[in-house]
């Protein structure tokens, strides 16, 4: 900043903050929303550790694409480990009137995807996985490979610590992550932990969530807003 900004700008806190914000905007990559094209099926999977809000985020995305964008949407869940996880997603599917497939093993994935073949967008919910559990990460990799996912978004809680975020993103990179979704912005006091995450992972941020309300509490990520949250 000292190299780029004149002294009078550095002396003014507001001008200095604005300069820092513009620099941060260039350092925080955003990926834009999911693009679902009518008649061309797109399969998007959400992955991540436990408790970050993957299922609720799936419901928000599904409701927005179905009710607001009038896309033909289907759901797949492979989260058969967590108690009531399937029922939670099925409740959303019933409310929004979406077809849903439950997949218990990777070998069932292709037939489930075929049954949803005529849709514009398929959203795939996965079980939360510890980044330290290599066996479960490998199993997740098998599910995604069989699904032939077009996009894999890593869902992370914005209230997690810097080291945990960086470590989690590094471990999930092996499943082919293409973007990130940050959840629980309503619980975060700042996003200072974001810069090390994006610098190490190099993943663009696609969406932000800031509450539990379906379908309202989700927004497309914008670099300017993220820069302001970091500051």
Question: Where do the PLM segments sit?
Answer:
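Primarily NTPase-proximal linker/entry elements flanking Walker-type ATP/GTP-binding cores
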Residues: 1-52, 56-73, 77-80, 91-105, ...
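A short, aliphatic-rich alpha-helical micro-motif
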Residues: 38, 116-117
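Glycine-rich beta-strand-to-loop/alpha-helix junction loops that act as flexible
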Residues: 47-48, 125-127
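Conserved catalytic-core segment of NTP-binding enzymes
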Residues: 74, 85-88, 95, 104-115, ...
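Generic detector of well-ordered alpha-helical packing
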Residues: 78-80, 126, 184
């Amino acid at each position: 900043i000292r190299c780029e900004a004149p002294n009078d700008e550095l002396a003014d806190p507001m001008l200095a903050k604005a300069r820092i914000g513009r620099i941060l905007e260039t350092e925080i990559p955003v990926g834009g929303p999911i693009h679902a094209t009518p008649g061309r099926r797109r399969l998007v999977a959400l992955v991540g550790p436990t408790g970050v809000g993957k299922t609720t985020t799936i419901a928000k995305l599904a409701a927005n694409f179905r009710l607001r964008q009038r896309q033909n949407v289907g759901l797949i869940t492979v989260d058969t480990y967590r108690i009531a996880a399937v029922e939670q997603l099925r409740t959303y599917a019933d409310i929004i009137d979406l077809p849903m497939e439950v997949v218990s093993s990777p070998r069932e994935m292709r037939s489930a995807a075929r049954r949803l073949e005529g849709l514009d967008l398929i959203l795939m919910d996965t079980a939360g996985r510890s980044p330290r559990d290599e066996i479960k990460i490998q199993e997740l990799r098998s599910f995604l490979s069989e699904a032939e996912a077009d996009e894999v978004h890593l869902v992370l809680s914005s209230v997690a610590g810097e080291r945990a975020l960086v470590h989690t993103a590094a471990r999930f990179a092996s499943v082919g992550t293409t973007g990130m979704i940050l959840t629980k912005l309503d619980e975060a006091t700042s996003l200072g932990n974001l810069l090390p995450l994006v610098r190490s992972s190099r993943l663009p941020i696609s969406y932000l969530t800031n509450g539990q309300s379906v379908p309202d509490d989700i927004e497309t990520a914008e670099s300017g807003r993220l820069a302001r949250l970091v500051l």
